[in-house]
Amino acid sequence: MNKIKMIAAMFIAGILLTFVSCGDNGKSKKISIAYANWSEGIAMTNLAKAIFEDQGYDVKLLNADLAPIFTSISRKKADVFMDVWMPVTMEDYMKQYGDKLEVIGDIYDGARIGLVVPDYVTINSIEELNAEKERFSGQIVGIDAGAGIMKATDQAIKDYGLDYKLMTSSGPAMTASLKKAIDKKDWIVVTGWTPHWMFDR
């Protein structure tokens, strides 16, 4: 049974993409895959690693934040990144580096980002957040600062006049905070996205 719900889908019908650095001739049996510390990215990356290794490739995994990932791919220091949220969430990175990257395909169509609360929380929309500021301690628990969802949440705070502070953390820290709050039946609002395993717990 799901224990959380999305109260504000800031972007709907996003596409999760894979891209590679331009100019790869495909002859090398070595490949480096960059990934951010997000659950779906870790899963996809390790699955890809196993598949590449089964095909005889020597695979190197590179964990980093988004800005270094895009820089590394554009400079051919890494070959593949499988967790690009388009068209809006990572738009700025694609504008900056897109001419040096090659999109090779969609992984998931219909991705969403937004704000997430436990299902026992009695609000159902972003407009209701200010009225319950004290119960949420005036905080939205986010992930790493360079993530597109953080920029989108900052914009939502302005657009909806939310009297909240967006807290920077990480994907694992955000889900740990969510679990801790659910275990205590505390009110919490976090940045969230689908697909993500937290919606299936």
Describe each PLM feature range.
Residues 38-39, 60-72, 167-177:
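Short helix-initiation/N-cap motifs at beta->coil->alpha
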Residues 48-56, 131-166:
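Ligand-binding cleft/hinge of the Venus flytrap
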Residues 98-146:
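A conserved helix-loop-strand patch within extracytoplasmic ligand-binding domains
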Residues 18-21:
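C-terminal motif of bacterial Sec signal peptides marking the signal peptidase cleavage site
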Residues 79-82, 149-201:
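Ligand-binding pocket segment of bilobal, Venus flytrap-like solute-binding proteins
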Residues 1-8:
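Bacterial N-terminal signal peptides that target proteins for export
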